[in-house]
Amino acid sequence: MKRNGGTIGVFPLVVEMVVSGFLFLFILVLNLVMGALGYLMEKDDYDPDADLQKINKNPRKFQLGIMLALVEHGSVIALTIMLFIAFSPYNIILGIVWIIFRTGEGLIQYINEPNYWRLIEIARQYSLVSGAGKNSWSDLARSIFKTKDTRFKFAMICWSIGTLAFSIVLVTSDVVPQIIGWLGIVASVLVGFGTGIKLVKPRFKFEVVGALFGMLFEVIIGGWLLFYSII
């Protein structure tokens, strides 16, 4: 392979690509496990009373979900750095765009977690009171859920911009099959469009299509970088 007319060191490039591929797939697996533990990146319907009861029933499970979320956010930032090292020489400007926005994505989600962790204590307090006394704790939980959802939407806009920049590099550099890059472009546009509209119309469901395309893109690019790079 060549990078800006020069020969790329084979071993460093393979290492960068393999680690990037692993992180793509690792992040997807973490999201699945987090969902199974009750940690949701985004909620469409708010039922804080039911959520607080569920959290208080098994707080350790909820804690584990948050800890895995912290690992996921850190992995997003690590992936961004590895992709920048491996691919930015093909287009440094687009490389700077994706490292800014995808690092921003990870940092925005980190900001959520201290408040989300508070739900464990809120759930405990909620269980100790009855009647109207529950309302204040329920309202506080609802506020935390809404704040998290809003921040998540901004994180997804960062994902969209960063992934669009990365995908354009994939299409123009011929490092991977162009179809993968085009899939990333489609996914990033759909996610950005759907998320932007949902900020205005919360009941808008089109972002699900973008999410499916985004997952498909990350599975394919992750698998290609992890396995094809070492063949």
Annotate each predicted stretch with a short phrase:
Residues K2-I231:
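Hydrophobic, aromatic-enriched alpha-helical segments typical of multi-pass transmembrane helices
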